[in-house]
Amino acid sequence: MSEIVNMVASTQVTESIDLYEVSDTLNIDYEAEQFPGMVYRVADPKVCILLFRSGKAVVTGAKSKEAVEKGLSIMVEDLTNHGFEMWPLKTEDISLENIVVTYNHGDLLDLSTLSLHMQFDKTEYEPEVFPGLIYRIDEPKSVCLVFSSGKCVITGCKSEEEAQEATDHLVDQLNTMPTFGF
């Protein structure tokens, strides 16, 4: 069974915003020399929103699209209540940039053998450099990290449907391979 562990989404919440003023008003740390965005944290749902002076907001840490929307709504309402001019939040203007999914195959995997059986030009396995097998899927465009424990990380999907398709594709690939008990 797969599980979404992170979603990254972006949207425009205003034309531009003075992050120093936001920092002073909301008592949020902002160090432009360190990072050009301000980190706005929401407790429930637990997400971080990177707010840039251009008015762009990038949500990280969400586990669902609903959490993305709720986190943005909380921030926009907070800023509006403190006198900042914000645009109305529209769901269709929120763009999912990346979804990270984990999957546990449940069996130990021999990555050396697996790398020989999977499509050569889509697979990288160099255990001296990285302990997992890297498997690239063309459609939907995504990258899978497969570990000998049977645990997998799938990243690069732009929708929950794509994440499920990529997981299904990886599962099909793994199910055609023999399992190994070490």
Where are these regions (language model features)?
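Intrinsically disordered, low-complexity polar/charged tails and linkers
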Residues: M1-V143, S149-K151, C157-F182
